[in-house]
């Protein structure tokens, strides 16, 4: 059971103008981009050479909630937490890395570089979580930057990129002209452990769900079906390459498609950190 932090540590958002502190959630502006905001948590013990945990919001843009919910876990596990903010007007295609508009992957790399410089945290390998649309971004980031990723946890993505080179990105991993620098190395991304978490009540075809015919046919009709299918396909492709990679799929008890309820009822925070940092 996770011990709660003090009220100040768990809920405070410290303005950027205040010097960086430990044990509080800091709101910062990226030094190289005055329009880019992110939230940062540096644990009381740690920072220097600490691992970096990144949590990515979905279309609700609830970055503050992500930062507040995960701060206690970052403290307990001694990791530096980053929660990037991606407003829809700047990142209209962030779930797919950014084929149009600003490139969410490039901005995240800049944030990570700044945090590593400010805190001394290790940016060699990243530990990522995303919920809903944020989970779509996270697994596509893993596909594009496998050398930067240690492990990921995906919370109820609406649909997935498949490890299929005959299908054009973002449905598959066939490169596209609008992102020529992104090439996919299946041997590398299939080596990264992944856990998919979906609420056991997350079986509605709601307005936000991709209902295209091709996604329904290839992946299933609900987030539960699609998550299970993707884990099975990734595991199969890894085995074909002789890779003993861990892929996990878990249903969260009494949880619909809601970040807050999945954290409160479904134990999503505990399951996320248990998978990302099994040695801690």
For the regions a language model picked out, list residue spans one by one.
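The feature captures the conserved acid-bearing segment of alpha/beta-hydrolase catalytic domains
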Residues: 151, 159-239
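C-terminal catalytic histidine-bearing segment of alpha/beta-hydrolase fold enzymes
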Residues: 231-280
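A domain-start/cap signature at the N-terminus of enzymes
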Residues: 7-52, 126-136, 145-153, 159, ...
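Short, hydrophobic alpha-helix immediately C-terminal to the catalytic nucleophile
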Residues: 109, 139-143
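Bacterial N-terminal signal peptides
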Residues: 1-6
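Alpha/beta-hydrolase
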Residues: 54-56, 155, 252
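Serine-hydrolase catalytic machinery in alpha/beta-hydrolase-like enzymes
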Residues: 31-37, 49-127
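Short beta-to-alpha linker loops that shape the active-site pocket of alpha/beta-hydrolase fold enzymes
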Residues: 85-89, 158, 255
């Amino acid at each position: 059971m996770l011990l709660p932090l003090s009220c100040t540590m768990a809920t405070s958002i410290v303005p950027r103008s205040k010097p960086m502190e430990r044990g509080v959630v800091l709101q910062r502006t990226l030094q190289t981009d005055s329009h880019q905001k992110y939230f940062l948590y540096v644990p009381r013990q740690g920072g220097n050479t600490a691992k970096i945990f990144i949590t990515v919001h979905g279309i609700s843009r609830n970055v503050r909630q992500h930062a507040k919910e995960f701060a206690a876990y970052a403290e307990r596990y001694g990791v530096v937490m980053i929660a990037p903010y991606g407003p829809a007007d700047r990142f209209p295609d962030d779930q797919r890395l950014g084929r149009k508009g600003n490139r969410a992957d490039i901005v995240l790399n800049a944030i990570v570089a700044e945090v590593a410089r400010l805190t001394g945290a290790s940016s060699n390998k990243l530990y990522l979580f995303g919920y809903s649309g944020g989970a779509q971004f996270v697994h596509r980031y893993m596909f594009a930057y496998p050398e930067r990723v240690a492990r990921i946890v995906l919370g109820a993505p609406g649909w997935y990129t498949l490890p299929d080179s005959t299908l054009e990105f973002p449905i598959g991993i066939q490169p596209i002209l609008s992102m020529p620098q992104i090439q996919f190395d299946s041997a590398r991304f299939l080596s990264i452990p992944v856990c998919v978490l979906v609420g056991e009540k997350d079986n509605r075809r709601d307005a936000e769900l991709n209902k295209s015919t091709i996604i329904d046919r290839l992946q299933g009709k609900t987030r539960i079906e699609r998550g299970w299918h993707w884990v099975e396909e990734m595991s199969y492709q890894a085995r074909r390459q002789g890779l003993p990679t861990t892929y996990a799929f878990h249903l969260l008890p009494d949880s619909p498609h809601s970040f807050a309820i999945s954290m409160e009822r479904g134990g999503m925070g505990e399951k996320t950190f248990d998978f990302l940092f099994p040695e801690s």
